[in-house]
């Protein structure tokens, strides 16, 4: 396992979650609309996961491309997991994003993702 890559993914995951939650708690009615359609950060996250996950899955080694892809993958994962819980547990309104159930769900899912990286790291120790 590339421990540096794991650290970058977890750092991007946690940083993106904290920044997104902070920004949207300050300005909860900030929406990203395209052609009259509200684009939730779940969809932005899925695009980042796809675009950045492919190079990570297909290219071995360490390069500037895999470093950037690691940041994008972690950021996309944070966006998708945070919004996923919010859309399941609430009515999807901007005000509901600020509810404790939404925050707790986001913390739980992002925490599970970071914990999963740690478990994979520990399981890979001693392997070539």
Predicted regions, residues:
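Cytoplasmic-side transmembrane-helix entry/capping segments in multi-pass membrane proteins
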Residues: 66-73
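Loop-to-helix transition at the N-terminal end of transmembrane alpha-helices
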Residues: 31-47
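N-terminal membrane topogenic signal
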Residues: 1-10
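Hydrophobic cores of alpha-helical transmembrane segments in multi-pass inner/ER membrane proteins
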Residues: 45-55, 107-120
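Interfacial helix-loop-helix junctions of multi-pass membrane proteins
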Residues: 85-102
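Alpha-helical transmembrane segments of multi-pass membrane proteins
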Residues: 13-27, 53, 75-83
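Membrane-interface capping segments at transmembrane-helix boundaries
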Residues: 120-128
């Amino acid at each position: 396992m590339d421990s540096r890559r794991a650290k970058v993914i977890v750092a991007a995951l946690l940083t993106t979650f904290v920044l997104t939650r902070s920004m949207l708690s300050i300005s909860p009615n900030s929406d990203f609309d395209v052609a009259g359609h509200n684009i939730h950060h779940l969809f932005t996250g899925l695009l980042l996961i796809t675009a950045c996950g492919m190079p990570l899955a297909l290219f071995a080694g360490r390069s500037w491309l895999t470093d950037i892809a690691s940041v994008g993958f972690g950021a996309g994962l944070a966006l998708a997991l945070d919004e996923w819980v919010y859309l399941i547990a609430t009515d999807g309104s901007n005000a509901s994003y600020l509810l404790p159930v939404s925050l707790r769900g986001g913390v739980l899912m992002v925490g599970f993702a970071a914990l999963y990286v740690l478990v994979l790291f520990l399981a890979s120790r001693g392997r070539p």
